[in-house]
């Protein structure tokens, strides 16, 4: 069964519609379909992950001090570490490289801040972050400036291919991914969202996920929601 394609023009129904075919929208469609919802993703461009996802630095890290963010990052990394198994595609390679993430400072007065960050990381369950002196940093990374006096480091941070992650989420999903299909309006009735008009027909639905990235404000206004985006 085709999953990523240009659909014929006709009206449809779906349990959920995701607008935007970047890594966030595609991951959302994956999890919605995994939860048993008949899901359609619509993407205006020729393919998935071709706009902001394609411009990503593609780095990931668990070194966050925000209580709401750190657990999400940690769980995401654990998912990436077993991505092929998790999406059900044996051998799918997302180019995962866990060669570490180093935060350095050349200011002695910042060392207490690094120590406080380390304490917070451990408190949030990220217990494999190290606090290094400048000399310890240069033993591992000889190219680091002699002006660096301290750093935090986590070996399991790194980078991956956002394109391959996006494609893996799509191909491992039971959702349908409509490319060259632009959302032009969002319909709302007394019960809430009722459908999405696209350049290839209307999709009746009660669930719409706005994953349009820089165009999220435009999509929001279609549904009468003014998002604070600039």
Task: Tell where the protein language model's regions lie, with residue ranges.
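Dinucleotide-binding Rossmann-like beta1-alpha1 core, especially the glycine-rich loop
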Residues: 57-140
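Glycine-rich Rossmann-fold phosphate-binding loop(s) that bind the pyrophosphate
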Residues: 20-22, 26, 44
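Glycine-rich FAD pyrophosphate-binding loop
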Residues: 33-53
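Helical element adjacent to the flavin cofactor pocket in flavoenzyme catalytic cores
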Residues: 152-207, 211, 215-218
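Conserved Rossmann-like nucleotide-cofactor binding loop
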Residues: 24, 47, 215
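Glycine-rich beta-alpha-beta "Rossmann" dinucleotide-binding loop(s) and their flanking helix/strand
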Residues: 218-230
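Extreme N-terminal leader/targeting segments of oxidoreductases
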Residues: 1-16, 31-35
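Helix-loop-beta segment of a Rossmann-like dinucleotide-binding subdomain
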Residues: 11, 92-103, 128-134, 138-173, ...
């Amino acid at each position: 069964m085709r999953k990523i394609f240009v659909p014929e023009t006709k009206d449809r129904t779906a349990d959920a519609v995701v607008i935007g075919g970047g890594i966030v929208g595609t991951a959302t469609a994956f999890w919605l379909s995994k939860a048993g919802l008949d899901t359609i993703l619509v993407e205006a461009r020729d393919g998935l992950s071709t706009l902001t996802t394609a411009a990503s630095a593609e780095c990931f890290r668990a070194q966050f001090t925000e209580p709401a963010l750190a657990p999400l990052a940690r769980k995401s990394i654990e998912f990436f570490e077993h991505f092929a198994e998790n999406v059900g595609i044996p051998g799918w390679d997302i180019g995962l490289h866990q060669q570490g993430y180093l935060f350095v400072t050349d200011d002695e007065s910042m060392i207490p801040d690094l120590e406080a960050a380390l304490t917070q990381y451990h408190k949030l369950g990220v217990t494999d972050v190290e606090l290094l002196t400048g000399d310890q940093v240069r033993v591992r990374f000889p190219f680091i400036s002699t002006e660096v006096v301290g750093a935090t480091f986590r070996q399991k941070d790194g980078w991956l291919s956002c394109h391959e992650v996006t494609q893996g989420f799509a191909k491992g999903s039971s959702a349908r991914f409509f490319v060259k299909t632009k959302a032009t309006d969002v319909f709302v009735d007394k019960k809430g969202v009722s459908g999405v008009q696209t350049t290839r027909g209307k999709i009746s639905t009660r669930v719409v996920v706005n994953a349009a990235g820089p165009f999220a404000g435009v999509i929001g206004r279609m549904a009468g929601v003014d998002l604070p985006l600039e």
